[in-house]
Amino acid sequence: EINSPGEPGVYYHMGIGFPSGPVSAEAAAILSELHEQSAARNRALVRRVNAYLAPVEIDYEADVLPLTPAGNATERHIVVAYIEAARRKEPDPTVFWADRLGMDRAAVQKAMADSAGFQNVVRNKLMKKGGPGYVQPGHDTFPPVEKLNALTVACGALPCAAWLDGLSP
C-alpha cells in the first residue's frame, strides 16, 4: 500500500500551482486520454451497480453527466444519480435502500436525514471494497504517475506527492 488503504499499487498524486487559461496541445491530448479512461471506468461501475440495484438503474449519459460542471463525473456524481433514481422509481426509497445496503430501515432513515452523509453510506456500501460495484484496481485501472507528471508539467504546475493523513510519508 502506498496511500490508498487496501489498494496496493494505487497512489494518489496531485499537482499544485496550475495557472488559469487554456492548456497546451500536449496537455489537452493527455487530458482527453484521461477523460476517456475515467469515463470507461465509470461506465463499467454503473453497469455493475445497475445489475445489483435493479430495477433502479441509471444511464451514465442521461443521469450522471448532467450533474457535472464539465462532464468529468466522479463516484459522487454517480451516487447522487442513484439516490435520485430510487426517489423517482421506488414507492418507499427507505425500504429499497435498507434492502440493497443491508441496513436496518431506521438506520437508513437516520442516514437519509443528512444528504452528504447518506451519499457517503451509499458510496461506501456499493462502490468501495466489498461492494457490488467494486473491482480491485489493476496496473491499468488508473493512469501511470509518469503521465500525470507530464500533464502537470505541461500545464506549468508542480507534481506533488499526496499523503494519506496529510502529514507523513
Please state what every model-predicted region is.
Residues 1-168:
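Extended substrate/RNA-proximal surfaces in nucleic-acid metabolism proteins
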